[in-house]
Amino acid sequence: MADPATEIPRAFVQKCLASNEMGDATLYIAKNAGKRLLNQTSGEWMKWVGHHWEIDKNSSEALAAMELVVSEYRQEAKRLVDEISDAKDTTVKNGLMAKQKELYRRIDRLRSVRGTNNALTYTARCEDRLIVNQDDFDKDPWALPCKNGVIDLKTGQLWPGDPKDLLMKYCPHEWQGLDAPAPMWEKAILDMMNGNQEMADFINRLFGYSITGLTTEHVLPVFWGKGRNGKSLLVETLRFVLGEMAAPIRSEMLLDQAFMKSSSGPNPDIMGLKGLRIAFANETDSGRHLSTSQVKQLTGADSLVARNPHDKYETRFYPTHTLYLLTNNKPHVPSWDFAIWKRLILIPFGISFVDEPRHPDERLIDKELGEKLKQEAAGILAWLVRGCLVWQFQGLNYPQLVMESTGEYRNEEDFTADFVDECCIIGKEYKCRASDLYDSFTRWWEDNQGKKVPSQKVFGKVMAQKFDRKKNMVFYYHGLGLLETPLDA
């Protein structure tokens, strides 16, 4: 991009004058390159604010910047005063006077609403220096813009923002270095984890990874526990620290829906993920089921396509977010879906913060802690970046508690366990034909679940993990048999 402070040559100004609206637009671009952009996806003007780009609401500054073009024309008109006075040849003098008159007419036109809007309209048809698309923004996963620069997440160093980097989402706090302290925050995390330092360190690595724009871990952390356990405090504090880089999403985006929304219409929920580093889904009602297809889509690395209601075009972008689910109720997840269990990790929040602690898993609540933590914003930002640096060397490195909790969760979701308990008998002397077992399972499922029956292939995969399946003309399961009637009949 051209340096907007560079003096514009007179010949260039005169050429722009001769090209009418297209010339006005060309001169506008020369004066505003590096200061303004036109997002042609949304039709919005953007402004450079030191280290990142922001939306120019109502295009007010883009419109006001037309005065820079007016100023160039006015300076040229003033230069012509001496040239007209010095001109001896009448024809030359008349030509200069006509050019000056045209400059003043152009100035008057550009100071009208119609003239300004026309010039901005033509700007979109000129060179590409001021034209971008929505998917051009926020593509560097290792850059974290903040109030006083851009943090390099690979090193923890700060550099000045560059308009060419097209960074838009930013953290609204200053970077004060890796050593900025956050003692109350670190104690709060440790308290939430019941003094388990291994878990507190894991939370640090997890969020450290999450502030990158990478999706290499393909992970869905589920923060689970009964109410008043610090989940909301943790999330709201991170939202305060990270600003628009962390945001909530509707939990319905992750759940099975009775009616599917048309994919051809606007989908602002997906569009809201553009450029985020951390996305939080809050609370799921008891008995709800995760949508495996949605979870895989929203926690994967494949590009997403979305459009806001008033956008002119769809935007295709690669995800930059880590998605978290915060819930008091564990949603149902198919135990046989190996892909989703590779993503899902259950992180228990087992401590409750209450006014009058009476039980071993209760602690005294500090109702002012949320406001106190805001004072540690710079330190919490440093804590996040330190976690990112540790993650780069150690990976997420799941603690034993996380692996055990996730395994227990998966066992709870084993849809065949109740069927085997109610309809089968186990012993090495028993065997059952696979087709008979599936027929019995289908009847049991329809009576008890009322939803679509898992396919025979899926059922077979799960049962084959538990019982020896052999083929003798047809498949048999060895080690279990069918009861003549269910136990509760």
Language-model regions, residue ranges each:
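Active-site-surrounding "flap" and adjacent substrate/cofactor-binding loops of secreted or lumenal enzymes
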Residues: L63-A77
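Trp- and S/T/G-rich repeat-edge/linker motifs of beta-rich repeat architectures
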Residues: K47, H52-M66
